[in-house]
Regions:
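C-terminal catalytic domains of large/alpha subunits in multi-subunit enzymes
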Residues: 1-250
Length: 250
């Protein structure tokens, strides 16, 4: 895939499939380059060492060939016996099964007894998405996913009137979490490589947001355990909690 022409973004779990294809193609390309360099240097493939963009003879590093020169040689028909012209490789990858990520979320939730306002005091995540290609992106993905999940659990609600007209059509009516609604998070990354792809990846596209609503609901139920309520709907707005405590309010 010509990366400068086609881009699919870094969302979802594209790196599991697309990244694996790139890795396999890169390995095949390097093997081709080593084979071609060995023939150009007149040595065995095992005697060739790659140093960045230079291929050298292990026993005599002065004997070398630059990658650019190697690419020019590779473009010539018959440049090396048994090597197709061109310094390129194509590889297709189809995973044999889905590589599932896993994790556990813990939340500290407080409910104001007078206003029924829920406050999140802390959030902890232990997460295993396989090998981390870019830990910074993974960290940001989980933080953003938790914030998204908190919005679903506590704020975001689509409402309609009796005529079916939306009542939450603007950001004045449709509540989203603000920065002060998102607590500090402690995220622990586990790296258990998946055997289902060459890079050991599992993906981190959605797993950070899926447990949030459930763990917040469980924490609120625990906080209000003396009242004997059971949370079965989101979001847990003060009005919703008041209705749970006093169903006669409708």
């Amino acid at each position: 895939m010509p990366g400068g022409v086609v881009g699919t973004g870094d969302g979802g779990t594209r790196v599991v499939v697309g990244g694996s294809a790139v890795a396999l193609a890169a390995r095949a390309l390097r093997a081709k380059a080593v084979r071609l360099a060995a023939q150009q240097l007149g040595v065995a493939e095992d005697d060739v060492q790659q140093n960045g963009t230079v291929f050298v003879e292990r026993a005599n590093p002065e004997r070398r060939i630059e990658l650019g020169r190697l690419a020019a040689v590779a473009a010539m028909a018959g440049a090396a016996h048994g090597v197709a012209p061109g310094l390129e490789a194509t590889h297709y990858f189809q995973p044999p099964d889905i590589a599932y990520a896993s994790g556990a979320h813990v939340v500290l939730a407080e409910v104001d007894a007078d206003t029924m306002q829920v406050r999140i005091g802390g959030y902890w995540v232990s997460h295993d998405s396989g090998r981390l290609i870019n830990p910074t992106i993974v960290e940001g993905q989980i933080q953003g996913a938790v914030a998204l999940g908190l919005g679903s659990a506590l704020f975001e609600e689509i409402r309609y009137d009796a005529a079916g007209q939306p009542l939450t059509a603007t950001y004045m009516d449709y509540a989203l979490p603000r920065s002060d609604d998102v607590p500090p998070m402690q995220i622990d990354h586990l790296e258990t490589p998946s055997p289902l792809n060459p890079l050991g990846l599992k993906g981190v596209g959605e797993s950070g947001t899926l447990p949030v609503a459930a763990v917040v609901a469980s924490a609120v139920e625990d906080a209000l355990a003396p009242r004997g309520i059971r949370v079965e709907q989101m979001p847990l707005t003060p009005a919703a909690l008041c209705r749970l405590l006093r169903p006669e309010l409708g």
